[in-house]
Amino acid sequence: MNKAKFLEVISGGLIVSCQALPGEPFYTEEGGLMPYFALAAKNAGAVGIRANSVRDIKEIKEKVSLPIIGIIKRDYPPEEPFITATMREVDELVAIGVEVIALDCTLRKRHDGLSINTFIEKVKKKYPQQLLMADISTFEEGKNAYQAGVDFVGTTLSGYTKESKKQNGPDMKLIKQLVQENICVIAEGKIHTPEQARQIKKLGVAGIVVGGAITRPQEIAKRFVDALNKEEKDV
């Protein structure tokens, strides 16, 4: 799928992130659960899926035919980047045919010792037809990655790095800044409500990814519990 077709497919719609990590209730060593989240998303009208790991992506592709933004989360301590952080992960994702590969494009020190610009250059040289999405946390990171040649910039990591401001909702300021620079933005990160998604859509983004607010029941339940506990304390 080329960039124009992907943009056409996701335009105005919802991409649902279907992920579960070790230690979370919906993670199992055997797999098998994420495809049903993806199927539910498809049945609700979602236009795309974001998913983690070769296993989950393969299983999801058997259930739905929606385009997939694929990632592989793999830790490389002491370095912080862990989302498709090396060529090893890129190779694995290309091999299973995901439409878009998302990768950490922050300016933090990397396990492979490369600058993010050099890494992007190497990926594009090896896989010139592969669509790439930059997961970033700041305007500087987003602009840098886009100029380096990625197809889309995602606000995925805003609030999750030392370089970005912690907040409870989506980083509207960052989204606006990137859009105003004519960067192709896929908004993602802490989008908790349909109204927030509607507001983001009006900013002119290329796409919107929602994850925890849909596919992580433990997080959803905790927001309700925290709100109720706060109300009791306020009385």
Swiss-Prot record:
<keyword id="KW-0119">Carbohydrate metabolism</keyword>
<dbReference type="GO" id="GO:0006053">
    <property type="term" value="P:N-acetylmannosamine catabolic process"/>
</dbReference>
<dbReference type="InterPro" id="IPR007260">
    <property type="entry name" value="NanE"/>
</dbReference>
<comment type="similarity">
    <text>Belongs to the NanE family.</text>
</comment>
<dbReference type="GO" id="GO:0005829">
    <property type="term" value="C:cytosol"/>
</dbReference>
<dbReference type="GO" id="GO:0005975">
    <property type="term" value="P:carbohydrate metabolic process"/>
</dbReference>
<protein>
    <recommendedName>
        <fullName>Putative N-acetylmannosamine-6-phosphate 2-epimerase</fullName>
        <ecNumber>5.1.3.9</ecNumber>
    </recommendedName>
</protein>
<keyword id="KW-0413">Isomerase</keyword>
<comment type="pathway">
    <text>Amino-sugar metabolism; N-acetylneuraminate degradation; D-fructose 6-phosphate from N-acetylneuraminate: step 3/5.</text>
</comment>
<dbReference type="GO" id="GO:0019262">
    <property type="term" value="P:N-acetylneuraminate catabolic process"/>
</dbReference>
<dbReference type="GO" id="GO:0047465">
    <property type="term" value="F:N-acylglucosamine-6-phosphate 2-epimerase activity"/>
</dbReference>
<comment type="function">
    <text>Converts N-acetylmannosamine-6-phosphate (ManNAc-6-P) to N-acetylglucosamine-6-phosphate (GlcNAc-6-P).</text>
</comment>
<dbReference type="InterPro" id="IPR013785">
    <property type="entry name" value="Aldolase_TIM"/>
</dbReference>
<dbReference type="Pfam" id="PF04131">
    <property type="entry name" value="NanE"/>
</dbReference>
<dbReference type="InterPro" id="IPR011060">
    <property type="entry name" value="RibuloseP-bd_barrel"/>
</dbReference>
